[in-house]
């Protein structure tokens, strides 16, 4: 798992696992490819720079945003049960925000499990700030070692699948922690299955057992979803429009004028999918450089991000397509949010068939 250490003052080791240090070049290509596609899209990765992470955290504290409260309730009531599936002397890799990780790490400490925890983030400042806050929250740790990884999901797949012998943790098991409904933020559940499969195959290549702890939104109440993701909510709008500012930074030019754009959202219960769009208020021409100009008509939707609202049945299909089985689900009392334990098909657990536990408010 080759990586280059990045010096910084957070008190945790941070390694650069990016395959290409100039990640902006990949984003530039993704922007132009998306504007050429039908329908037009922009890469959701634009939303998750350091400022985007800050703005999303502000949005997540909105009264109507039900996911955060439900996830915290499950973590409060069930974290000690959830971490029982994480073996001692193993690796825990978090794909996403560190905002709610502390409860699980404290549960691992209480169970006295030596575990190496890696946090993956595409933003160096976002990663180091989160690690600093996590260390402040947790204080001295005796069993869990915390390390940061700078890179994308694809970089993490490559890091897992190409061990260099430099990593001091000799472990047969890697548990991937994916909270905040991030699994459903890809374009389609097939893409989510594909990414899960890539991680499983990377572990296979390194002779590691692979399992996932995934938190996913199962809410099917259209009114609740539409209220939570109302694009006129100022905090959500600020988060989304920051993605256009980030696009300008990536392109090295003011291709997007945020004042020319509004935001819209639509929930499609039959697909269990929420879509969020950028919509120009007038006809715009986007000069992205290299003599390339893209035209977007007034009212034409450009997809910013997708968010699946997947019930247990669909989540089971996602897992199965990726070569995983569902071992356990921990849910809130309304059945709108779940933590799932998925494991590779050749592994066995004493719990037997899939079980569901409910967390109460």
Curated annotation (Swiss-Prot):
Family according to the record: Belongs to the methyltransferase superfamily.
Function, as annotated: N-methyltransferase; part of the gene cluster that mediates the biosynthesis of benzomalvin A and D. The pathway begins with the loading of amino acid precursors onto the A domains of the non ribosomal peptide synthetases benY and benZ. BenY and the A1 domain of benZ are loaded with anthranilate (Anth), while the A2 domain of benZ is loaded with phenylalanine (Phe). N-methylation of Phe by the methyltransferase benX may happen before loading of Phe onto benZ, after loading of Phe, or after dipeptide formation.
Keywords, sorted A to Z: Methyltransferase, S-adenosyl-L-methionine, Transferase
Protein's name according to its UniProt entry: N-methyltransferase benX
UniProt cross-references to Pfam families, sorted A to Z: Methyltransf_33
GO molecular function (one): methyltransferase activity
Top EC group: transferase
Annotated knockout phenotype: Leads to a tenfold decrease in the amount of benzomalvins A and D, but not their complete abolishment.
């Amino acid at each position: 798992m080759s990586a280059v250490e990045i010096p910084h003052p957070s008190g945790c080791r941070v390694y650069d696992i990016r395959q290409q240090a100039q990640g902006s070049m990949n984003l530039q290509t993704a922007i132009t490819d998306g504007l050429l596609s039908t329908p037009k899209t922009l890469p959701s990765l634009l939303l998750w720079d350091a400022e985007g992470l800050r703005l999303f955290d502000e949005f997540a504290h909105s009264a109507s945003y039900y996911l955060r409260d439900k996830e915290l309730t499950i973590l409060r009531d069930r974290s000690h049960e959830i971490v029982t599936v994480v073996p001692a002397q193993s690796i825990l890799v978090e794909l996403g925000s560190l905002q709610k990780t502390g409860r699980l790490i404290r549960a691992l400490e209480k169970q006295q499990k030596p575990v190496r925890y890696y946090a993956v983030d595409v933003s160096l400042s976002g990663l180091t700030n989160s690690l600093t806050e996590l260390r402040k929250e947790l204080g001295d740790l005796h069993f869990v070692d915390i390390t940061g990884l700078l890179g994308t999901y694809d970089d993490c797949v490559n890091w897992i699948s190409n061990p260099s012998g430099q990593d001091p943790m000799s472990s047969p098991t890697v548990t991937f922690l994916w909270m905040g409904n991030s699994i459903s933020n890809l374009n389609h559940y097939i893409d989510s299955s594909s990414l899960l499969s890539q991680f499983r195959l990377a572990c296979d290549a390194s002779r590691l057992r692979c399992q996932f702890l995934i938190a996913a939104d199962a809410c099917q109440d259209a009114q609740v979803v539409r209220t939570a993701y109302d694009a006129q909510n100022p905090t959500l709008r600020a988060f989304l429009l920051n993605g256009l500012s980030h696009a300008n930074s990536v392109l090295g030019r003011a291709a997007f004028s945020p004042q020319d754009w509004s935001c819209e959202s639509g929930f499609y219960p039959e697909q269990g999918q929420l879509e969020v769009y950028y919509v120009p208020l007038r006809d715009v021409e986007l000069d992205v450089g290299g003599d390339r100009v893209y035209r977007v008509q007034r009212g034409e939707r450009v997809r910013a991000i997708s968010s699946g609202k997947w019930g247990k049945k669909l989540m089971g299909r996602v897992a199965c397509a990726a070569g995983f089985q569902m071992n356990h689900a921990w849910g809130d009392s309304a059945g709108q949010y779940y933590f799932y334990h998925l494991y590779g098909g050749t592994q066995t657990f004493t719990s037997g068939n899939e079980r569901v536990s409910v967390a109460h408010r």
